[in-house]
């Protein structure tokens, strides 16, 4: 197959950041994706309906002229979140609340420290129809970073899912066979997103031959057996798994430092890279479901009506992109060849 047309896709997990960065990140995503779930981990975090609505307006202001791109907003759960916050968020059009264990990722220090105390909030979310998006890692300092996802399932996620069967839960950016198996065996209210980097890479691509800071993300890349498990589940076409890039921009100097930031900025190549993965797996017929159907169906939103055409044509991801402030950012797969390309009119 040398050409593939799919329903216009959505990105069910990304980071736009804020301020001048929006002039880069919003157009990069809006070129192909009609909607995106926008993460709330700003400084300060987006913890309520008012902050979410204001952030949404800043994103809309950064859309390219004529764009119909729609940001889908989320709020950031803390131990101070109330049921009224959930009610107000739902009324304001917020679609989900994000659970970050404190310290799990960029700007998550304000997040949840006593997870069991949030069970009344999960009950409110179940009642009012707000989805729960989970960064599924434990964060105690003595626990090995490669074990944190599996332990989160065991300690917390299984209990949350069992306690709230009417609560839709998205296990975001899964990285392990443990997570894939958990989602596959869970009830229909549980789904997962998978990033391009976790399908394309494993921890050797981060650590062998020198540290590769632009492949560093959280949850961290795992061993190849976990990568292969993720590739296997997307190849099945299961509706429980859908596209979430976790595109997460950081300026070049913040990645290439003694204490580099976590995140891969994949917005400019994500769909094409997913196509490459599905092609490698002999499963191109499953790409449309993963990119364009399973996500809206799980969220209870209409599927998009437009289409995107990909052609089998090699191109090279730019080595750098210059941000509006003049600083460079290195995109994911910078300088690498990609075998699929979006066809432009």
From Swiss-Prot:
A Pfam family annotated for this UniProt entry: Amidohydro_1
CDD domains documented for this protein: DHOase
Pathway: Pyrimidine metabolism; UMP biosynthesis via de novo pathway; (S)-dihydroorotate from bicarbonate: step 3/3
InterPro entries in the cross-refs: Amidohydro-rel (IPR006680), DHOdimr (IPR004721), Dihydroorotase_CS (IPR002195), Metal_Hydrolase (IPR032466)
Gene Ontology molecular-function annotations: dihydroorotase activity; zinc ion binding
Residues holding substrate: 15-17, 41, 135, 218, 250, 262
Residue list for modification N6-carboxylysine: 98
Cofactor note: Binds 2 Zn(2+) ions per subunit.
Entry cofactors: Zn(2+)
Active site: 246
Entry binding sites for Zn(2+) 1: 13, 15, 98, 246
Catalytic function, reaction form: (S)-dihydroorotate + H2O = N-carbamoyl-L-aspartate + H(+)
Disulfide bridge positions per record: none
Chain segments annotated as coiled-coil in the UniProt record: none
EC number annotated for this UniProt entry: 3.5.2.3
Keyword entries, A-Z: Hydrolase, Metal-binding, Pyrimidine biosynthesis, Zinc
GO cellular component terms, A-Z: cytosol
Keyword Hydrolase in record: yes
HAMAP family assigned to the protein according to its UniProt record, in alphabetical order: PyrC_classII (MF_00219)
SUBUNIT field: Homodimer.
Protein name: Dihydroorotase
Gene: pyrC
């Amino acid at each position: 197959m040398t050409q593939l047309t799919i329903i216009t896709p959505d990105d069910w997990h990304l980071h736009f950041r804020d301020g001048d960065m929006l002039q880069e990140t919003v157009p990069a995503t809006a070129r192909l994706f009609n909607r995106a779930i926008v993460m709330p981990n700003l400084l300060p975090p987006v913890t309520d309906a008012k902050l979410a609505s204001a952030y949404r307006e800043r994103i809309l202001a950064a859309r390219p002229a004529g764009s119909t791109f729609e940001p889908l907003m989320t709020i950031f759960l803390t131990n101070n979140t109330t049921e009224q916050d959930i009610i107000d968020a739902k009324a304001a059009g917020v679609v989900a609340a994000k659970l970050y264990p404190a310290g799990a990722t960029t700007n998550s220090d304000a997040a949840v420290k006593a997870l069991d105390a949030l069970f009344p909030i999960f009950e409110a979310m179940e009642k009012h129809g707000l989805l729960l998006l989970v960064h599924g890692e434990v964060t105690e300092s003595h626990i090995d970073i490669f074990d944190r996802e599996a332990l989160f399932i065991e300690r917390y996620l299984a209990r949350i899912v069992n306690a709230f069967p009417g609560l839709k839960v998205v296990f975001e950016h899964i990285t392990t066979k443990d997570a894939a198996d958990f989602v596959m065996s869970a009830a229909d209210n549980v789904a997962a997103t998978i990033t391009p980097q976790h399908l394309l890479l494993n921890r050797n691509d981060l650590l062998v031959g020198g540290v590769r800071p632009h492949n560093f993300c959280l949850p961290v890349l795992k061993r190849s057996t976990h990568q292969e498990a993720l590739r296997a589940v997307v190849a099945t076409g299961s509706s429980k798994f859908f596209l979430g890039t976790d595109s997460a921009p950081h300026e070049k100097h913040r990645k290439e430092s003694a204490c580099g930031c976590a995140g891969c900025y994949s917005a400019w190549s994500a769909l094409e890279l997913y196509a490459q993965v599905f092609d490698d797996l002999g499963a191109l017929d499953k790409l449309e479901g993963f990119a364009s159907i399973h996500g809206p169906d799980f969220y209870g939103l209409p599927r998009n009506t437009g289409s995107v055409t990909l052609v089998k044509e090699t191109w090279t991801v730019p080595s750098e992109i210059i941000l509006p402030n003049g600083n460079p950012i290195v995109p994911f797969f910078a300088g690498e060849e990609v075998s699929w390309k979006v066809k432009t009119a």
